[in-house]
């Protein structure tokens, strides 16, 4: 299935010059969303995943159905102040500054094989920070899956040494 035909390109959003990839027009078609999810599930089964981890917010909508299909848990990675219990955190760079990502301190057991999911690989900063959180808790990043990769931003370079699946490339 050609998933790209279900992604809407929104010009000049959120700012001029950006060609935003809107995945809601993929997700609102059950058969297409299921197909995309199934592709990631097939990849994850080969990796013998124990847990799926995804950064907010679109990492949740990719990762939760994958975790459900695999029969494993899902651990959210959130911005600082959004998780209610004890967390570990990591600073990461944004285009114009820094932000902080957190995960519950007990979300991952040492040695667990983790699949990280997100909707989009752009610069790689969010996933690089997510990897740091997973590994700090003793998890093993067995794979990383995205719906879309923006190849011209070269985010894959920050993830060198990790196995990556992308379903679409722009």
UniProtKB/Swiss-Prot annotation:
Entry's EC annotation: 2.4.2.7
A GO cellular-component term linked to this record: cytoplasm
Gene Ontology MF terms: adenine binding; adenine phosphoribosyltransferase activity; AMP binding
EC top class named in words: transferase
Compartments, record wording: Cytoplasm
Biochemical pathway: Purine metabolism; AMP biosynthesis via salvage pathway; AMP from adenine: step 1/1
Catalysed reactions listed for this entry: AMP + diphosphate = 5-phospho-alpha-D-ribose 1-diphosphate + adenine
Keyword tags: Cytoplasm, Glycosyltransferase, Purine salvage, Transferase
GO biological process: adenine salvage; AMP salvage; purine ribonucleoside salvage
Protein's UniProt keywords contain Cell inner membrane: no
Family, similarity comment: Belongs to the purine/pyrimidine phosphoribosyltransferase family.
Function comment: Catalyzes a salvage reaction resulting in the formation of AMP, that is energically less costly than de novo synthesis.
Assembly behavior: Homodimer.
Protein name per its UniProtKB record: Adenine phosphoribosyltransferase
Source lineage: Bacteria, Bacillati, Bacillota, Bacilli, Bacillales
Name of the coding gene: apt
